[in-house]
Amino acid sequence: MRRIPRIPSTASALCSSSSSVASTSAAPLRTLRAAADSSSICQSCSFSTQTSATRNRVWQNTVQTQRRCASTVTETTPEAPVAAAAAETATESTETVEQQRKRKGGFFETQRQVNLVLPGQPTRADAPEKIRDPNYEPATSGAGLQEIGGMSDWWSKPEHFRDGGKQFEYQGFAPQEKITDPRLLKVILRRALAEGLALKKFGANPKNPADMASIIGNGDHWQRTVSVEMCRGENGELSLKNESDLQKVWILMRNAAEKTYYQREWQEEINRLRSLGEKEQAKQLLEEGKKLGYRLKSEEGSLVKLTVDEAVELRKSWNNDWKEAIIRDPVVKFYAAKRIQKMTGHILSDGKLTSIQTVANFMDALVTPPKPKKLAEQIEQSSILPELPNVKVYPRRVTPVDKERMVGRWKVIQKELQKRELPVLGTGNHGKYVELKWLGSKQ
């Protein structure tokens, strides 16, 4: 058995610069800074998120309680993983923040508090020779003895989950309802490509571009992101006309990632305060977070805060040259696919991504509806047969019962069958004709 150390880590939103990082494992909110080298982004683009004094005061009052409620986890592991974990911990302690960011691909894993009530340490009963009760008779086997405690049904009891187990409920990456309007899909595609270009220029390791797509959160700032001018760059590849537009888009992405991270910690702290019975502090923190624009998960709704009229208005300033631009970079293509999946629910398979070469191909793969799975669906979508006066299309096979219902005889037939105690549908309790066996036919 070994005790896993709690390694302090910063937010998973974006990495911070090597100059200054304000982060501790105990502090519920951490100030994030720009994730870029000094050579790629100028000093004027660096920023930090300001928090109000009221929120800091509320959080500081709960830091000590959070430390008391922090739990440790024990597990049994072989010697090799233990040595690997120790080596990784030693490496992180000697590396700078910028070196850790590059080694981990540009992102930090978030250390989240698990709302579990862990079982206590096992206790042993006294030895038989130490018991002075003369009526005590030690058992020779476990048959018939009462079982006290144990781990057989520990995780089946709701009181062992401080939040009722909501933290462990499955949360899908993509929304359940897909966006099918082509006008919205084209605007979302343009935003995803602009963010992908900014991520390629200033962002993370090419191994995990989808991490950014999963933490950006709600799609705000549509006007500032979509209004950037796209064009065909060198060798016909897609690029932004102005270099400053890439920096603007990147800053918007970092701000959105920080907001998502702070909002998640804010909601976790509210749930923790409510579970401890500190309703006044939870209410104060809830009001302060709403002033900063934070929303609970139940209040977020759809990820895309964009209407059809707004999408049509945004498309008026676009040129048509960007549609013929080539997309060769796999980071841009893969990030755009994951970002679209996160916001619209459309999943672009690897085969489709491989065949996509230009923006127009990407748009066609996204806007074109999927092929119908049934022949009836294909006939319904076609406008030839349904428009004929003597043709009617049904979604399924027309049975004899359906034909009787069309002419109005089914109720009479059903009534007569019930009067004779015969099954209305199927054979009921009646077997097959015995005459078939006499005639030697197959049953």
Swiss-Prot record:
GO terms for cellular component: mitochondrion; ribonucleoprotein complex; ribosome. It comes from the Eukaryota. Its main location: mitochondrion. This is Large ribosomal subunit protein mL50. InterPro entries: Ribosomal_m50. Residues 126-135 have a biased composition (Basic and acidic residues). Residues 121-145 are annotated as: Disordered. It is found in: Mitochondrion. It comes from Neurospora crassa (strain ATCC 24698 / 74-OR23-1A / CBS 708.71 / DSM 1257 / FGSC 987). Coiled coil: none annotated. The keyword Transmembrane does not apply. The keyword DNA-binding does not apply. Component of the mitochondrial ribosome (mitoribosome), a dedicated translation machinery responsible for the synthesis of mitochondrial genome-encoded proteins, including at least some of the essential transmembrane subunits of the mitochondrial respiratory chain. The mitoribosomes are attached to the mitochondrial inner membrane and translation products are cotranslationally integrated into the membrane. Keywords: Mitochondrion, Ribonucleoprotein, Ribosomal protein. Belongs to the mitochondrion-specific ribosomal protein mL50 family. Component of the mitochondrial large ribosomal subunit (mt-LSU). Mature N.crassa 74S mitochondrial ribosomes consist of a small (37S) and a large (54S) subunit. The 37S small subunit contains a 16S ribosomal RNA (16S mt-rRNA) and 32 different proteins. The 54S large subunit contains a 23S rRNA (23S mt-rRNA) and 42 different proteins.
